[in-house]
From Swiss-Prot:
<keyword id="KW-0963">Cytoplasm</keyword>
<feature type="active site" description="Cysteine persulfide intermediate">
    <location>
        <position position="51"/>
    </location>
</feature>
<comment type="pathway">
    <text>Cofactor biosynthesis; iron-sulfur cluster biosynthesis.</text>
</comment>
<dbReference type="GO" id="GO:0016226">
    <property type="term" value="P:iron-sulfur cluster assembly"/>
</dbReference>
<dbReference type="GO" id="GO:0005737">
    <property type="term" value="C:cytoplasm"/>
</dbReference>
<dbReference type="InterPro" id="IPR003808">
    <property type="entry name" value="Fe-S_metab-assoc_dom"/>
</dbReference>
<comment type="function">
    <text>Participates in cysteine desulfuration mediated by SufS. Cysteine desulfuration mobilizes sulfur from L-cysteine to yield L-alanine and constitutes an essential step in sulfur metabolism for biosynthesis of a variety of sulfur-containing biomolecules. Functions as a sulfur acceptor for SufS, by mediating the direct transfer of the sulfur atom from the S-sulfanylcysteine of SufS, an intermediate product of cysteine desulfuration process.</text>
</comment>
<dbReference type="Pfam" id="PF02657">
    <property type="entry name" value="SufE"/>
</dbReference>
<protein>
    <recommendedName>
        <fullName>Cysteine desulfuration protein SufE</fullName>
    </recommendedName>
</protein>
<comment type="similarity">
    <text>Belongs to the SufE family.</text>
</comment>
<comment type="subunit">
    <text>Homodimer. Interacts with SufS.</text>
</comment>
<dbReference type="GO" id="GO:0006790">
    <property type="term" value="P:sulfur compound metabolic process"/>
</dbReference>
<dbReference type="InterPro" id="IPR023939">
    <property type="entry name" value="Cysteine_desulfuration_SufE"/>
</dbReference>
Amino acid sequence: MAGLPDRDKLIRNFSRCLNWEEKYLYIIELGGQLAPLTEQQRHPENLISGCQSQVWIAMTLSAEGHVIFAGDSDAAIVKGLVAVVFILYHDLTPQQIISLDVRPFFADLALSQHLTPSRSQGLEAMIRAIRTKVANLSAH
């Protein structure tokens, strides 16, 4: 997660944005900080269904049992939302990710009411897919 802020800094930075245009630009900037995916990570099994844009999310377990994320999207704002999700789940174990309800966090940022319905549905699809995949990660 090199380059991405931690959860508290994300909230601080987001609150400093004066309007939604600045917040969107900040989200896009976060997406630009994601490391590029390898061709292997762009495998169809990492493609998230339910998103209007193409979204890939790859996950592995660290030696300490924390989930390591890699992701990308063909849409700049969605790539930024991927980065926001990764910030929320950073340094967590599969069980912690499954237990964590991120919806209140999105409500605090007022993301839900400022995203189009299709983007909100895509965000929900991303969260569901991550929870399903981490459950499979911890089972292996």
